[in-house]
């Protein structure tokens, strides 16, 4: 059965974003436009998914910063 551990999140579940768009306002309004399969990153509070299989999900949270890029952790 699925249960969420209360331990420190692993490296892979830390919020990260490769495609991040910010406005030029102060403070900036930033939104991560990464498309992920079946879920959004761990810190996302507003996750919007398509009804396809697998679902394509985008986090629509507005932040005043961008998360660290995901790519750096696993280079091909």
UniProtKB/Swiss-Prot annotation:
Keywords: Disulfide bond, Protease inhibitor, Serine protease inhibitor
Domain of life the protein comes from: Eukaryota
Protein name (record): Bowman-Birk type proteinase inhibitor DE-3
Protein species of origin: Macrotyloma axillare
Similarity remark: Belongs to the Bowman-Birk serine protease inhibitor family.
GO MF term list: serine-type endopeptidase inhibitor activity
GO annotation, cellular component aspect: extracellular region
Site (Reactive bond for chymotrypsin): 51-52
